[in-house]
Swiss-Prot record:
It comes from the Bacteria. It comes from Ureaplasma parvum serovar 3 (strain ATCC 700970). PROSITE patterns: RIBOSOMAL_L36. It holds the Pfam family Ribosomal_L36. One of its GO terms (molecular function) is structural constituent of ribosome. This is Large ribosomal subunit protein bL36. HAMAP family: Ribosomal_bL36. GO terms for cellular component: cytoplasm; ribonucleoprotein complex; ribosome. One of its GO terms (biological process) is translation. Transmembrane segments: none annotated. Coiled coil: none annotated.
Length: 37
């Protein structure tokens, strides 16, 4: 899980979702998991 000011989709499997006010990237590749904060 990377915590970044700017979350971007890294590959075609990355999906940007908003969970309880927090922007997250979920992906099949666990290295691509990100959270905005």
């Amino acid at each position: 899980m990377k915590v970044r000011a700017s979350v971007k989709a890294i590959c075609k499997d990355c999906k940007i979702v908003k969970r309880s006010g927090v922007v997250r990237v979920i992906c099949a590749n666990s290295k691509h998991k990100q959270r905005q904060g």
